[in-house]
Curated annotation (Swiss-Prot):
Homodimer. Pfam families: AIRS, AIRS_C. CDD domains: SelD. It comes from Shigella sonnei (strain Ss046). One of its GO terms (cellular component) is cytoplasm. Mg(2+) binds at D51, D91, D227. This is Selenide, water dikinase. ATP binds at K20, T48, R49, D50, D68, D91, G139, H140, S141. Belongs to the selenophosphate synthase 1 family. Class I subfamily. Keywords: ATP-binding, Kinase, Magnesium, Metal-binding, Nucleotide-binding, Selenium, Transferase. Its cofactor is Mg(2+). Binds 1 Mg(2+) ion per monomer. One of its GO terms (biological process) is selenocysteine biosynthetic process. The gene is selD.
């Protein structure tokens, strides 16, 4: 079988960040007193569900450490590697940092898929690393039943510029740097529903590097930042609200969306991860139509950055975004928490 005819998505039961373990199950796995390692230099662990761990070196600089890997979300091997690497590196940018090196994580069904295809995957990962200005310095591989690829990435950040979920504040405006609908469009493609004019749109968005995060972190009024991935906008926004003790009001019409996404939702192109996300976070939402819920819970792979920005910094944030070719519009705001009200209200 040639590399051009291979369909990687047929060799896995999940796709991209949609194959994450559900938040409910993950909570059970992580719920342990022994998981609460006490080290005053560990600035960010897993308590607030942030994108990466952060360790203070004591000299004004902190180290960021993260890992991310998944099964194919596209059929093209090079694109799969590039997307997986871009997604992993994004965690460093979401914490306000600069990546400095990466190592690869590869699981490969050697009796089903040739090593030449695995090489294409790793070349895609290496390409993304070059885009981020870092080396793919090594890695580890295993014989697996399904193809898996990703990175463990190390970065650095000025300690005072670390961006965490828990540092969001009431009064902040919310901005999203990429459109939603990646899970929907990739599912539509698998179901042969995707229109010719929408071919390649999701791949282009997934390959777009969140490199602007390091520049956003230098803006005083950017209070919190996270990337929107497998738990969808609802999940990652809810975790920001829970960490900071605030609530969110979101303007649905202002949310950037991939072309055709609402039509594909009506046609049933909804990934399985959407239901898992709703089962974990749905109780935090107000009432809304099913199609709105399906978009907000849509698992994103290599999604955009979600920023919480004080109003006085809005113009500076938009100007910085424009330098990276990003057009920003506020999608909502954070407000003080009040009992009896949904954590995330959709208007």
């Amino acid at each position: 079988m040639s590399e051009n005819s291979i369909r990687l998505t047929q060799y896995s039961h999940g796709a991209g960040c949609g194959c994450k373990i559900s938040p409910k199950v993950l909570e059970t796995i992580l719920h342990s007193e022994q998981a609460k390692f006490v080290d005053p230099n560990l600035l960010v662990g897993n308590e607030t569900r942030d994108d990466a761990a952060v360790y203070d070196l004591g000299n004004g600089t902190s180290v960021i450490s993260t890992t991310d890997f998944f099964m194919p979300i596209v059929d093209n091997p090079f694109d799969f590697g590039r997307i997986a690497a871009t997604n992993a590196i994004s965690d460093i940018f979401a914490m306000g940092g600069k990546p400095i090196m990466a190592i690869a994580i590869l699981g490969w069904p050697i009796n089903k898929l040739s090593p030449e295809i695995a090489r294409e995957v790793t070349e895609g990962g290496r390409y993304a690393c070059r885009q981020a200005g870092i080396a793919l310095a090594g890695g580890h591989s295993i014989d697996a039943t399904e193809p898996i690829f990703g990175l463990a990435v190390t970065g650095i950040v000025p300690t005072e510029r670390v961006k965490k979920n828990s540092t969001a504040q009431a009064g902040c405006k919310l901005f999203l740097t990429k459109p939603l609908g990646i899970g929907v469009l990739t599912t539509a493609e698998k179901k042969s529903l995707l229109k010719p004019e929408h071919q390649g749109l999701a791949t282009e968005v997934m390959c777009r590097m969140n490199i602007a995060g390091a520049s956003f972190a230098n803006i005083e009024g950017v209070k919190a930042m996270t990337d929107v991935t497998g738990f969808g906008l609802l999940g990652h926004l809810s975790e920001m609200c829970q960490g900071a003790g605030v609530q969110a009001r979101v303007d649905y019409d202002a949310i950037p969306k991939l072309p055709g996404v609402e039509e594909y939702i009506k046609l049933g192109a909804v990934p399985g991860g959407t239901e898992r996300n709703f089962a974990s976070y749905g109780h935090l939402m107000g009432e809304m139509p099913r199609e709105v819920r399906d978009l907000l819970c849509d698992p994103q792979t290599s999604g955009g950055l979600l920023l919480a920005v004080m109003p006085e910094a809005e113009n500076e944030v938009k100007a910085t975004a424009a330098e990276f070719g990003i057009e920003l519009t506020a999608i909502g705001e954070l407000v003080p928490a009040r009992g009896g009200r949904a954590m995330v209200e959709i208007r």
